[in-house]
UniProtKB/Swiss-Prot annotation:
It comes from Polynucleobacter necessarius subsp. necessarius (strain STIR1). One of its GO terms (molecular function) is proton-transporting ATP synthase activity, rotational mechanism. One of its GO terms (cellular component) is plasma membrane. InterPro entries: ATP_synth_F1_ATPase_gsu, ATP_synth_F1_gsu, ATP_synth_F1_gsu_CS. This is ATP synthase gamma chain. It is a peripheral membrane protein. Keywords: ATP synthesis, Cell inner membrane, Cell membrane, CF(1), Hydrogen ion transport, Ion transport, Membrane, Transport. GO terms for biological process: proton motive force-driven plasma membrane ATP synthesis. Pfam families: ATP-synt (PF00231).
Length: 289
């Protein structure tokens, strides 16, 4: 049985660990709220672009934008969004499992895959897997900036425009609520025409005047729309990261509390046994005299 000194040392060590995990839990909760706000603020921008594109497409039914061009799929690109840091439970593991399944399924069809990594954890996974990597960006911080992301994602978008890639997928973790996050692998390009169908609304319809022409405006807006979707995915992934970290740190704090309770019980038993032994020795010595 460990001595009382050793047990006291263990209790102090676990208490210090619990202070750290509790602080990390509070920091993650604060960051999660800010990430949720950024996520909500990004949605109206993409929705407004979608609305304008839908109305312009309806007014120009014969125009087929480059981002909506469908062709036989021989090579795909995937933008993988993960975290830069750990301590967020199985968040990255779940989305990387989707990527592993995608690789297996596409290899069976002899379809090539080219990846873009956003986040250190995904980059490490792709390097270990010896996957084809065409661009990357890591250490993007707690606040995503489009000027940081654009350098990595433009490689995929331009490859699709040139016909070098026939489809682009986006893998990330969707934020549902503070206790639930879902790994997602969804098709980004080509855009589905149904997704850009204008919603039926009562009231006046917009009549746009386009300069230099509607086709140029549509192509430009669609690119901004796709970029906004990627930004939204990164924002959701960050909110998911902080919520998962908050839950993980809370679980760690609760476990530390339980361990401290068990160690305190062991300490009391050990101390009681030592006192009983001393009393027995005193009584035995007195009887001998």
């Amino acid at each position: 049985m460990a001595s009382t000194k050793e047990i006291r040392s263990k209790i102090k060590s676990v208490q210090n660990t619990r202070k750290i995990t509790k602080a990390m839990e509070m920091v993650a909760a604060s960051k999660m709220r800010r990430a949720q706000e950024r996520m909500r603020n990004a949605r109206p921008y993409a929705e407004k672009i979608r609305e304008i594109v839908a109305n312009l497409s309806k007014a120009n039914p014969g125009f087929r934008p480059a981002y909506m061009a469908t062709r036989e799929v021989k090579k795909v690109g995937t933008i993988l969004v993960t975290t830069d840091k750990g301590l967020c439970g199985g968040l990255n593991t779940n989305v990387l499992r989707l990527i592993a399944n995608q690789v297996r399924d596409l290899q069976e069809k002899n379809i090539e895959i080219a990846y873009t990594a956003i986040g250190s954890k995904g980059l490490q996974f792709l390097n270990r897997s010896k996957a084809k990597l065409i661009s990357q960006t890591i250490q993007i911080g707690d606040i995503p900036h489009m000027d940081v992301l654009i350098g990595a994602i433009v490689s995929q978008l331009e490859a699709f425009e040139r016909g070098e890639i026939d489809a682009v997928y986006l893998a990330y973790t969707r934020f549902v609520n503070a206790m639930k996050q879902e790994p997602v692998l969804e098709k980004l390009l080509p855009l589905e025409s149904e997704a850009l169908t204008p919603q039926e609304k009562t009231g006046n319809s917009w009549d746009y005047i386009c300069e230099p022409d509607a086709e140029s405006i549509l192509n430009g807006l669609l690119k901004r729309y796709v970029e906004a979707m990627i930004y939204q995915a990164v924002a959701e992934n960050m909110a998911s990261e902080q919520s998962a970290r908050m839950v993980s740190m809370k679980a760690a704090s609760d476990n530390a509390k339980n361990v401290i309770g068990e160690l305190q019980l062991d300490y009391n038993k050990t101390r009681q046994a030592a006192i009983t032994k001393e009393l027995s020795e005193i009584v035995g010595g007195a009887a001998a005299v």
